[in-house]
C-alpha cells in the first residue's frame, strides 16, 4: 500500500512538472541556437555596448541578447502554454511586447530614463487593472486586506521598482542572468506547489532562456542581454511575485503563509542594492539616477575580484537568502523581514571592509616592492 502511494506521488509530481520541463528545455534550445546568429548580425550592424568609465568591460560587446531570450521564452509558451482570452493574460503578454520593443529602441538609440519610467508605470497600472494586484500583506505589520487605492499603489511601486532593480543590477557578466534564473526557478516551483501550474510555466520558460543565455554571458561575455532582456526579466519576475502572493493569500492552507516576505527574499539583492545606492547618492547631494560604480558588484570588482567570482559569490548569497527565507517560514513575518534586512546590511559592511582591507594591503605591498595579484 505504501509502495502504491509512493508511486502515485511520483506520478502526480511528474504530471505537475512535465510541461514545466518541456517549457524549460524548449526555451533553452531555441535561445541556444538563436544567440550565435544574433551575435553575428549585431556585429555586422555595429550594435555594440561601448566601454566607458562607469562600465566594467574593456572592449565593445554585442548587446540585445534579450532578443534570443524572449524568442526562446515565447516559442516555449506558444507550444506548451494554455493561452486564453482572459484579461490578465492579454495585459501580461501585451506588456511584455511593449517592454521588449522599448528595450530594443533603448539599446539602439538610448532612450531617456523618464520616457522608460512613464511606460513602466503605464504597464504596471495595466497589470493592476487586470486584477493582478497586491491585495493583502498577510498580517505583515498587522495589515491584512488593503484598500483598493493601496492595492494599485503597492502593485505599481513593486512592478516598476523590481523591473528597474534587475535592470540596474545588470552590471557584470552573468549577474542579472544568474540572479534571474535562480529567482525564476524558485517562483516556478512554488507557484506549482501553490496550485498555479499554468503561471509557473512562464517562470520555467524564461528560466530556460536565461540558462542558455548564461552560456554566452559568463566572463568573458560574448553578448549582453541589454535593456531588451533586463527590462522584461525584471517585469516578469515582479508580476510572478505578485501572483505568488495572490494565490497564497487566497488559499485556505497556503504553501507560503509568509508569502510577502518570501517574495521579498526572491528579489532582495537587486531591490536592496538599488535602494541603498539611491539613498547614498541622495545623502551625498547627487541625483539618485546619476550612474556611478557603487553597486554591490562594484564593491567586489573594485577590490580586484573577477567578474566571474563576483557574480558567483553574489548568486551564492542569493541562494542562501532563498533557503533562509523559506526555512524561517514558521517565524513572524516582521521578524523574518528584520533578519533579511540585517543580513543584507552585514553583507554590505563586510564587502566594504574587504575593499578597504585589500586596498590598504595593496598600498603596503606596492610601497615595499611586494607584487599584488
Task: Label each region the model flagged.
Residues 91-120:
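Hydrophobic alpha-helical hairpins/lids featuring a short glycine-rich hinge
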Residues 97-98, 102, 119, 123-134, ...:
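Membrane-embedded alpha-helical core segments of multi-pass
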Residues 75-87, 105-111, 129-141, 247-248:
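Transmembrane alpha-helix boundary signature
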Residues 2-41, 46, 70-86, 90-97, ...:
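Alpha-helical transmembrane segments
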Amino acid at each position: 500500500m505504501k509502495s502504491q502511494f509512493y508511486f502515485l506521488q511520483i506520478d502526480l509530481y511528474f504530471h505537475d512538472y512535465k510541461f514545466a520541463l518541456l517549457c524549460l528545455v524548449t526555451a533553452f534550445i531555441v535561445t541556444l541556437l538563436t544567440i550565435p546568429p544574433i551575435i553575428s548580425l549585431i556585429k555586422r550592424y555595429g550594435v555594440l555596448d561601448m566601454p566607458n568609465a562607469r562600465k566594467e568591460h574593456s572592449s565593445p560587446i554585442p548587446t540585445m541578447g534579450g532578443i534570443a531570450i524572449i524568442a526562446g521564452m515565447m516559442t516555449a509558451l506558444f507550444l506548451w502554454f494554455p493561452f486564453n482570452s482572459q484579461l490578465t493574460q492579454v495585459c501580461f503578454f501585451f506588456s511584455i511586447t511593449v517592454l521588449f520593443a522599448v528595450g530594443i529602441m533603448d539599446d539602439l538609440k538610448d532612450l531617456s530614463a523618464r520616457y522608460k519610467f512613464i511606460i513602466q508605470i503605464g504597464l504596471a497600472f495595466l497589470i493592476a487593472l487586470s486584477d493582478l494586484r497586491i491585495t493583502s500583506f498577510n498580517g505583515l505589520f498587522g495589515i491584512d486586506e488593503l484598500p483598493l487605492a493601496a492595492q494599485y499603489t503597492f502593485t505599481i511601486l513593486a512592478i516598476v521598482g523590481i523591473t528597474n532593480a534587475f535592470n540596474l543590477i545588470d552590471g557584470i557578466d552573468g549577474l542579472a542572468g544568474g540572479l534571474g534564473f535562480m529567482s525564476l526557478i524558485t517562483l516556478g516551483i512554488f507557484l506549482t506547489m501553490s496550485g498555479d501550474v499554468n503561471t509557473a510555466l512562464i517562470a520555467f520558460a524564461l528560466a530556460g532562456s536565461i540558462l542558455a543565455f548564461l552560456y554566452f554571458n559568463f566572463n568573458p561575455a560574448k553578448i549582453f542581454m541589454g535593456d531588451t532582456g533586463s527590462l522584461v526579466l525584471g517585469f516578469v519576475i515582479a508580476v510572478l511575485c505578485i501572483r505568488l502572493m495572490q494565490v497564497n493569500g487566497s488559499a485556505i492552507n497556503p504553501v507560503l503563509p509568509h508569502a510577502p516576505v518570501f517574495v521579498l527574499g526572491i528579489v532582495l539583492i537587486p531591490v536592496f542594492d538599488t535602494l541603498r545606492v539611491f539613498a547614498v547618492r541622495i545623502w551625498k547631494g547627487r541625483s539618485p539616477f546619476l550612474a556611478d560604480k557603487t553597486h554591490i558588484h562594484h564593491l567586489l570588482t573594485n577590490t580586484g575580484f573577477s567578474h566571474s567570482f563576483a557574480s558567483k559569490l553574489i548568486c551564492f548569497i542569493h541562494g542562501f537568502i532563498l533557503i533562509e527565507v523559506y526555512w524561517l517560514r514558521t517565524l513572524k513575518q516582521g521578524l523574518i523581514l528584520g533578519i533579511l534586512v540585517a543580513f543584507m546590511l552585514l553583507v554590505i559592511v563586510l564587502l566594504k571592509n574587504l575593499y578597504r582591507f585589500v586596498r590598504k594591503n595593496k598600498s603596503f605591498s606596492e610601497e615595499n616592492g611586494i607584487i599584488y595579484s
